[in-house]
């Protein structure tokens, strides 16, 4: 039997929103396999589909800037929200974005080695800022995009940099449309541009979970297939940008809105500060442990 730790129970709770003891039981039944435990809870109707990147824990800010040909979205982390609101920190983030936009390095490692206008490397520039600001600071990630003449970048920053989105539309130069799409992505967080981008493996996996879910609900086998077909279609529309109701006008889809301008979404990047990074929460672990031992 797998050793089910308090940390595992905590992680499953965060990913599914299910109760503590339900999570413990799911992990026991699946011998500690986190992904199978998520499916177990969903099949029992206890949890909804988990988004693997939902765990937001660190501080900092995102930033998006562009010029006529290129755009960059990046995330810089700090230890506290207080520092993230500090003018010096925000100036550092802006300087790093301008540096990456100008140099367009291939990797994070390359970016840290590039030379700033003042002669310092990016790494030394960050190290100096750490000394001044008094907190650990790191350039976590970035993406650079390039566009053609008949294209448009959309930039949107939400909650003072908590979320940063960069979109690229082809077939239109309407930056307002591109920004509207970026705003939608910030709010709804789609996984894909279109349902055609969803892998066969993901579709089949979701179909299996939905089938078991319907059977566990006691539905007759002869109607399960139609139920699964309808639920799968709904699932695909929920994770695909083009199929989603547009936040500024729910009567049309995002795909239809973009088509009105003659364009098409070809890529998007959505960064949320700290997604996938977990803070240490000893008190919560102790609380869980006390329940697990009962």
Curated annotation (Swiss-Prot):
Might you report a single GO cellular component term? cytoplasm
Q: Which key words are in the record? A: Cytoplasm, Elongation factor, Protein biosynthesis
Kindly report the protein's main subcellular placement as a broad class.
cytoplasm
Protein's cellular compartments: Cytoplasm
Note the InterPro entries from the entry: EF-Ts_dimer_sf, Transl_elong_EFTs/EF1B, Transl_elong_EFTs/EF1B_dimer, Transl_elong_Ts_CS, UBA-like_sf
| Gene3D superfamilies linked to this entry | 1.10.286.20, DNA helicase RuvA subunit, C-terminal domain, Elongation factor Ts, dimerisation domain
Q: Where is this region: Involved in Mg(2+) ion dislocation from EF-Tu?
A: 80-83
Highest taxon listed in the record's lineage: Bacteria
Q: Which GO terms describe its molecular function?
A: translation elongation factor activity
What the record says about family reads: Belongs to the EF-Ts family.
Q: What does this protein do?
A: Associates with the EF-Tu.GDP complex and induces the exchange of GDP to GTP. It remains bound to the aminoacyl-tRNA.EF-Tu.GTP complex up to the GTP hydrolysis stage on the ribosome.
Against HAMAP family, the record matches this protein to: EF_Ts (MF_00050)
Among PANTHER family, the record links this protein to:
ELONGATION FACTOR TS (PTHR11741), ELONGATION FACTOR TS, MITOCHONDRIAL (PTHR11741:SF0)
The protein's name: Elongation factor Ts
Q: Per UniProt, what is the name of the gene that codes for the protein in this document? A: tsf
